[in-house]
């Protein structure tokens, strides 16, 4: 009889104790379509980092993590459908990996109290957290990137690019158009001529644009491309013998698959970046031990160290660290999206923290606040070595021109606030 009572007591206790649900970090991926070459390694890195936390650490704060995927195909309509289906899973944060999708879900995420992290993409003026309460774009945004390109050109031209001609080749979408306003302002400030050339989706046809570049003879070309557009552009630049060292892509046009198809002709091509490249980080030793060697990798495990795999890992790490902060701040392990949002708004990533995570110097230090959802806006430059088939960082991470960018962010964000009857919070 005593044994039966003990059994009943145990069962009652288990029934009364809350069952910890997984912490849900959905992946809005695109493993199909013309941009799959970029979508796959990012999604793999994102998933693998959370698998590492589950296998090595038992999750985050003792709670397991799940990473449900929803395939968007980089299609805005499908992306919105994914948002609607994923929000039923109580996600802590969404990462749409598409500027078009981001624009569509901004009002939804605010209404649904779901934070959205658009790392290095999305609506740039979302840096103003006083207006965009649930959108974060740390550690850098497109306008930081545009300024980073100009800063680098100033650096290699002894601080003077007046009279130079810079061509922008851009994907003809909300994504590709993001840097134009900033580059126009910077051209007025520094006296260079800006030429803009749109490339229609998906970017396989670019001969007319590069023939125009051959006629215009710009000193430098910068590119806001993605997917197949990038490798076509690099090949077309090689075809007209444009100097690769004068061709600088955005961070979404600076991965291995963007340059490998052109072979030796891509040597010297450059791209801005907001994080490190390569495999020389202790976290990747753990990734091999706990994830790849156990057969748990999202892919086949051979993308570790590639640019976009690393970016997926970085995005997952930043999400996980915000979740840890939310747990610490609230004393609640099974945190909510609202708690996650509050923690993201106070996130501070220091070098000491990155060292402890096995990611020393993986990215610049940055802090987030109510007023600043975009971090510090530090931008570096990487260059492709075709013979070694590797990217190398060739500049320091430098501050973008906030004298130009901050007023643009204020103007755009306040216009959004007026249109949507939003009272700035800070």
Question: Language-model segments: what does each one mean?
Answer:
Residues 22-42, 97, 165-171:
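Short beta-strand segments enriched in small/hydrophobic residues
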């Amino acid at each position: 009889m005593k044994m039966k009572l003990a059994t009943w007591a145990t069962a009652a206790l288990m029934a009364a104790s809350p069952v910890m649900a997984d912490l849900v970090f959905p992946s809005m991926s695109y493993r199909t379509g013309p941009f799959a070459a970029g979508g796959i390694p990012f999604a793999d890195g994102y998933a693998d980092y959370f698998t590492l936390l589950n296998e090595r650490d038992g999750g985050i704060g003792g709670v397991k993590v799940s990473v449900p995927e929803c395939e968007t195909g980089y299609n805005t309509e499908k992306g919105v459908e994914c948002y609607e289906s994923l929000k039923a899973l109580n996600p802590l944060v969404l990462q749409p990996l598409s500027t078009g999708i981001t624009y569509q879900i901004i009002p939804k995420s605010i209404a649904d109290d779901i934070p959205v992290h658009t790392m290095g993409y999305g609506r740039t003026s979302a840096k103003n957290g006083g207006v965009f309460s649930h959108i974060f774009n740390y550690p850098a945004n497109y306008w930081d990137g545009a300024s980073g390109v100009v800063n680098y050109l100033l650096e290699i031209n002894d601080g003077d690019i007046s009279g130079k001609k810079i061509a922008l080749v851009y994907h003809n979408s909300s994504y590709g158009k993001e840097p134009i306003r900033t580059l126009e302002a910077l051209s007025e400030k520094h006296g260079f001529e800006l030429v803009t050339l749109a490339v229609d989706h998906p970017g396989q046809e670019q001969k007319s644009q590069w023939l125009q570049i051959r006629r215009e003879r710009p000193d430098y070309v910068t590119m806001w491309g993605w997917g197949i557009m990038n490798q076509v552009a690099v090949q077309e630049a090689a075809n007209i013998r444009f100097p690769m060292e004068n061709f600088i892509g955005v961070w979404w046009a600076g991965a291995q698959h963007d340059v490998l198809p052109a072979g030796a002709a891509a040597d010297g091509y450059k791209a801005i970046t907001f994080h490190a490249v390569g495999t020389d980080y202790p976290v990747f030793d753990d990734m091999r031990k706990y994830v790849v060697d156990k057969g748990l990798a999202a892919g086949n495990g051979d993308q570790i160290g590639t640019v976009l795999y690393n970016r997926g890992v970085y995005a997952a790490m930043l999400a996980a660290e915000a979740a840890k902060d939310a747990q610490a701040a609230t004393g609640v392990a099974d945190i909510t999206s609202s708690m996650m949002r509050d923690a993201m708004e106070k996130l501070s990533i220091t070098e000491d923290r990155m060292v402890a995570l096995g990611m020393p110097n993986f990215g610049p230090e940055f802090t987030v606040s109510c007023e600043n959802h975009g971090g510090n806006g530090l931008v570096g430059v990487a260059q492709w070595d075709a013979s070694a088939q590797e990217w190398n960082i060739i500049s320091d991470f430098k501050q973008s021109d906030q004298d130009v960018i901050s007023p643009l962010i204020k103007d755009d964000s306040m216009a959004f606030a007026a249109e949507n009857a939003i009272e700035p919070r800070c």
